[in-house]
Swiss-Prot record:
The keyword Secreted does not apply. InterPro entries: Thiolase (IPR002155), Thiolase-like (IPR016039), Thiolase_C_2 (IPR055140), Thiolase_N (IPR020616). The lineage of its organism: Bacteria, Bacillati, Actinomycetota, Actinomycetes, Streptosporangiales. It catalyses: 17-hydroxy-3-oxochol-4-en-22-oyl-CoA = androst-4-ene-3,17-dione + propanoyl-CoA. Belongs to the thiolase-like superfamily. Disulfide bonds: none annotated. Keywords: Bile acid catabolism, Lipid degradation, Lipid metabolism, Lyase, Steroid metabolism. GO terms for molecular function: acyltransferase activity, transferring groups other than amino-acyl groups; lyase activity. Changing residue 82 to P: Almost loss of activity. This is Steroid side-chain-cleaving aldolase. Changing residue 296 to A: 13-fold decrease in catalytic efficiency.
Length: 391
């Protein structure tokens, strides 16, 4: 029996503005986000004794601590695999709090991903990954399979072949996200919704992906404060309890290129995450009132819905077409606009939106939301959360 479910909660969220050129260092972005989250929780930097971030983050825990007035650290950790780390940072923070290792842990991610190193350029546009991953890329890069969009296009084309999905089916994900972003003043695409025709007319990046199937490249930072549920109840905001937190890596897992499995149209690592989340929380898909699904590329939203039990394999296209991801639908999704509409902060801004949904303060609040399921990056070893109200 896990000691984790309900033992810890997210009590504070904070972010910088989301832009295309922040004009400041990644360390400054990290510190601004961390301080904003601490203030939102009604705490002081001196209360913090733990920090968690991504292995990809350039702002080390000790430098964030030094520059924010945080003192001694009893817990510090990093989670790997790019966007797959997002919910994993909260899992590690919650485990530290639940076991008494630390009392106040801040999770953060900050980068200049548009004005600095652009992930969209893939391995051709930045220093190549080292170690064993470089050997795996040797089977891809020399043949021109260099960028995340290209890697996902391979998956998307096979999914279309197997289940009859179309570019329009992918486009409906983008339309919903941009609709939600259009009413979110913090979103980059605030007041700029799109139509399915706009999606279809946007230029090809790599078939079958149009430009509007691809997430943004953003500058910004996001942070979250995790404390015990008991302590969170005495802080300013209604706590978002962590009812489930899990990581998952599937059989024959690769980084965005798991093409060697017997069946490549699913994302079994997300299925593994979902199984753990439901088991920990005692919930099932019908109990989930809203979702934040990692949307770096629209095609990968469809198999997430299937792996997590919201619809059967191959039926996500119909689930979406029926309006289920809309504010008034069965599963309001990415109410902040997602990474397509608000910003690409490796999924951390999505966790913050889940907290707002539990608090009842989202700009696109779909009524009372008791439980929110959040996912991290897909195509890589990944993670997920179920956040909910105090029971």
């Amino acid at each position: 029996m896990s000691v984790l479910p309900g033992a810890a909660a997210i009590a504070g969220i904070g972010a910088t503005e989301f832009s295309k050129n922040s004009g400041r260092s990644e360390l400054q972005l990290a510190c601004e986000a961390v301080l904003a989250a601490i203030a939102d929780a009604g705490l002081e930097p001196s209360d913090v004794d733990g920090l968690v971030t991504f292995t990809a983050d350039t702002s080390s825990e000790i430098h964030v601590a030094r520059n924010t007035g945080i003192g001694e650290l009893k817990f510090f950790s990093r989670v790997g695999y790019g966007g797959g780390a997002a919910c994993g940072t909260v899992q590690q923070a919650a485990m530290a709090v639940a076991t008494g290792i630390a009392e106040v842990v801040v999770c953060y991610r900050a980068f200049n991903e548009r004005s600095g190193v652009r992930y969209g350029l893939g391995q051709a546009g930045r220093q190549m990954d080292q170690g064993a991953d470089s050997a795996a890329y040797a089977w891809l890069l020399p043949f021109g399979l260099n960028t995340p969009a290209q890697w996902v296009a391979m998956f998307a084309r096979r999914y279309m072949h197997e289940y009859g999905a179309t570019s329009e089916d992918f486009g409906r994900v983008a339309v919903v996200d941009r609709k939600h972003a259009a009413t979110n003043p913090k979103a980059w695409f605030y007041q700029r919704p799109i139509t399915l025709e706009d999606h279809q007319n946007s230029r090809w990046i790599v078939e079958p992906l149009h430009l509007l199937d691809c997430c943004q490249e953003s500058d910004g930072g996001q942070a979250l404060v995790v404390v015990s549920t008991e302590r969170a109840r005495d802080l300013p905001h209604p706590p978002a309890l962590i009812w489930g937190a899990a990581q998952g890596s599937g059989y024959d897992q690769h980084m965005m290129t798991s093409y060697y499995r017997s069946e490549i149209t699913g994302i079994p690592e997300m299925g593994l995450v979902g199984q753990q989340l439901y088991a920990q929380s005692g919930l099932n898909p019908s109990d989930i009132g809203a979702a934040i699904l990692y949307d770096h590329f629209t095609p990968l939203v469809l198999p997430q819905l299937e792996e997590l039990g919201f619809c059967a394999r191959g039926e996500a296209k119909d689930f979406i077409a029926d309006g289920n991801l809309e504010i008034g639908g069965r599963l309001p999704c990415n109410t902040h606009g997602g990474q397509l509409g608000e910003a690409y902060i490796h999924g951390m801004n999505g966790i913050a939106e889940a907290v707002r949904l539990v608090r009842g303060t989202s700009v696109n609040q779909p009524g009372d939301v008791t439980n929110v399921l959040v996912t991290a990056g897909t195509g890589v070893p990944t993670s997920g959360l179920i956040l909910g109200a105090d029971r």
